[in-house]
């Protein structure tokens, strides 16, 4: 099957879960799963097809509160049964998360799906991958830098801000603007 799938939204509310609070807590606890958020929001029109084997209960078990999703974009191009992420991101009041990769419906597999918490320049701060079959996906641990240096992450951010010319490999450069 070939085609396109699109989901866009503004000023959405997710009741029962404070995403910004959980992401802030992540910096000190390292206990958060970006893939939960990515799969829930970004798969959009394709989500119900691929998430049968995925348990979202962990996303809603511990938080309370609510999240304001300022902007959501989920644009996918489908060729030969593989949906490739195009402009796939969302921004809350304080954070921006983006997704890359594909959903292989022919082989029922995640194709190099990567979810990242990104800064204002589109540079990844935390990266997490999802691999394997739709029925039993494997969520890899967050990138090594953040896992090892989690409690020091705030210091690294402050140091980087002192040298604004620092370079990064841009993960996302799409339509979803960073939080103000």
Regions from the language model: what does each represent?
Residues 1-180:
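Extended terminal
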């Amino acid at each position: 099957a070939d085609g396109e799938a699109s989901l866009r939204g503004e000023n959405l509310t997710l009741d029962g879960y404070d995403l910004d609070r959980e992401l802030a807590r992540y910096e000190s606890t390292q206990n958060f799963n970006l893939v939960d958020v990515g799969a829930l929001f970004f798969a959009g029109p394709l989500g119900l097809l691929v998430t049968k084997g995925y348990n979202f209960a962990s996303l809603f078990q511990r938080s309370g509160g609510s999240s304001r999703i300022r902007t959501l974009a989920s644009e996918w191009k489908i060729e030969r049964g593989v949906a490739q992420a195009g402009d796939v991101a969302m921004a809350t009041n304080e954070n921006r998360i983006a997704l890359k990769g594909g959903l292989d419906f022919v082989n029922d597999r995640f194709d190099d799906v990567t979810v990242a918490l990104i800064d204002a320049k589109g540079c990844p701060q935390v990266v997490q991958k999802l691999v394997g079959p739709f029925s039993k996906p494997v969520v890899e641990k967050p990138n090594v830098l953040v896992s090892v240096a989690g409690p020091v992450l705030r210091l690294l951010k402050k140091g980087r801000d002192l040298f604004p010319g620092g370079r990064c490999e841009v993960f996302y450069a799409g339509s979803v603007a960073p939080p103000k």
